[in-house]
Amino acid sequence: PELNKTFDGDRITSITGQPVGLAVATENHVVFAPVVQATVETPFAELVAQTRDLIGRTRAGQIRAEDAVPAAITISNLGMYGVSAFTAMVTPPQVMVLSVGAIRRVPAFDAQGAVVAQSIMTLTLGSDHRVINGAQAATFLGAIAQWLQKVPS
């Protein structure tokens, strides 16, 4: 809840629910950030279905008014273009942006010291420090990373 805010330059506003903006590029290279309503309790399969529906409707030009509600964070995924790491910019009134890089297979050591292939992905979180301090952002990014490690492949 302490991160679920927007900032218009003058006023910090708390928002209800857990809306997450998704950066979606259209074929004309216009980027929209429609919002999916997610919670930590939302089953992963349902979240995937909501996200696919929202992205499809955005690219088809069928965004609805309820898709454009305020969100505290937007997710920008350039990993789908093979980009390993990047830093997206926070777009007001949002106060955070999560940059998602490509999943890569790299050599790593398992618990017994054997070399194994491991999937890694770079996440970068930008935050507006007028609203979210660095410790809050780091804790939030750590929680996202832990959640993603539990997601079924």
Model-derived regions: residue spans:
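C-terminal catalytic/motor cores of large multi-domain enzyme assemblies
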Residues: P1-S153
